[in-house]
Amino acid sequence: MRVAVLASAGKDSAYAAWWAIMRGWEVECLVTVSVTGDDSMMFQLNGTAVAALQAASMGVPWLPVLSGGEEESEILELETALRGHNDCHTAFVRSWSNDWERPENLEIMVGAPDIDAIVVGALRSDYQKTRVDRMCERLGVISYSPLWHHESREHMCALVEHGFDVRIASVSSEGLGKEWLGRRVDDESLSELAELAKVHRFNLDGEG
């Protein structure tokens, strides 16, 4: 099974990529949508270029895609890139930080990836999953969402148990202050987060 992983650089897409590898599948590339607009219903906005470093560390190509973030258009922009109609050079330049050194082994995917399926790290967003599923139908490939509706605590514990280095990159909920920024999610911090999640009623896994 040859797959592309939709990678935002976040914990869930990283876990989805690991899941595919553990199944013995060939990860042909990581695909990252960089939003040039102010908002997106589909894709993560901040820090997505880190996915290029993840691709380099995995030894797989990276396919950067630009999107204006407009509702209903953004999934079509991703689909167009997966069909091989993508200015990968421009997408790389606009996605990459000038302050970063490009890894020597980072390979930029050119053209359409030869895949049987697309793997995504969607947890609970019907909006996102439905649109990815429909896109995959149009492309003639299978859509896999291995984390779909996983229980929050179990999912976070699995990340810690399997050695993922998860860092909190932003906070936008009551109960979480700037002291959490950059903090690693481990057994201790996860227990603290779980208590705060109960009190302030946010999702432990960061969804929504």
Language-model features: locations:
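ATP-dependent adenylation/nucleotidyltransferase module used to activate substrates
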Residues: 1-169
